[in-house]
């Protein structure tokens, strides 16, 4: 069975994925600590840790959360 992509391209994807995990972890940490650059403006969320948890759940379970309707 032949590989789908070459070894070099597979390593490139692995490195890019690891870099993305690091960047997203830093952003999540800044929201979680209520850093001023992320939650200090008028239009930014007031509760940083709650925003991080909701973002994680939406990323992890997108179809489950998308079916929850707001109360009217």
UniProtKB/Swiss-Prot annotation:
**Other comments on record:** Completely overlaps YPR170W-B.
Q: Output this protein's name.
A: Putative uncharacterized protein YPR169W-A
From the record, give the transmembrane residue ranges.
Answer: 11-31
Subcellular location(s) per record: Membrane
What are the alphabetically sorted keywords of the record? Membrane, Transmembrane, Transmembrane helix
Species whose genome carries this gene:
Saccharomyces cerevisiae (strain ATCC 204508 / S288c)
| GO CC entries | membrane
How does the entry describe its membrane topology? Answer: Single-pass membrane protein
- Give a single Pfam family match: V-ATPase_su_f
Q: List the disulfide bonds.
A: none
